[in-house]
């Protein structure tokens, strides 16, 4: 990891990125890929900004990005995800529930990014839950399927601790989400108007 989340400051993160390129780590991986010894180079990080920086310095095939493109967080649409499309970089997306609240809803002590969700996040999720309820759709299904609307996202890791949770994740992913739900979320300003939707991606295939 070379991100701020892992190292606690932008300065240390920047130093780790420089180390990757200055001390030959990236060069060695690039040579292995060129020789056919490995097929791809990627990084697992918690922030899209460092992914964008890495793409400015080298040729990466993909990133495992945790929790930075969700129903609650879409800043990656500004520049990073369009860059991924342009560079043919695939995203494996972890943390589609922002560590809990998009799965549990706005329950007492709901978790948002590993901490107690602040009031403004709780209110936003309540509004999302109301839209989902009006379409007889669980919030968790909307949260899991939303992220797959972007063509840079190749797969999603919702997390599971048992076979039962794996089966539950499959059921959530297979839940039918009406197109009108996405339209209502957009209409109420709960997701960005430029956020691509699962129905749009399916129609483009």
Regions found by a protein language model. Give the residues of each.
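Beta/alpha (TIM)-barrel catalytic core signal, keyed to glycine-rich beta->alpha loops juxtaposed to Asp/Glu
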Residues: 1-204
């Amino acid at each position: 990891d070379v991100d701020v989340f892992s190292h606690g400051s932008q300065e240390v993160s920047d130093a780790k990125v420089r180390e990757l390129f200055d001390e030959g780590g990236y060069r060695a991986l690039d040579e292995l890929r060129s020789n056919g010894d490995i097929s791809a180079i990627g990084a697992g990080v918690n922030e899209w900004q460092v992914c964008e920086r890495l793409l400015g310095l080298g040729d990466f095939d993909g990133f495992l990005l945790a929790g930075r493109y969700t129903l609650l967080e879409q800043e990656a649409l500004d520049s990073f995800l369009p860059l991924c499309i342009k560079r043919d970089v695939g995203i494996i997306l972890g943390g589609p529930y922002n560590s809990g609240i998009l799965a549990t809803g706005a329950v007492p002590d709901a978790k948002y990014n590993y901490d107690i969700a602040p009031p403004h996040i709780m209110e936003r999720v309540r509004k999302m839950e109301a839209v989902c309820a009006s379409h007889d759709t669980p919030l968790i299904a909307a949260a899991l399927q939303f992220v797959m609307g972007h063509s840079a996202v190749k797969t999603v890791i919702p997390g599971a601790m048992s076979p039962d949770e794996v089966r539950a994740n499959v059921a959530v992913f297979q839940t039918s989400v009406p197109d009108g739900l996405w339209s209502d979320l957009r209409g109420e300003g709960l997701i960005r108007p430029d956020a691509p939707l699962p129905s749009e991606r399916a129609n483009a295939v």
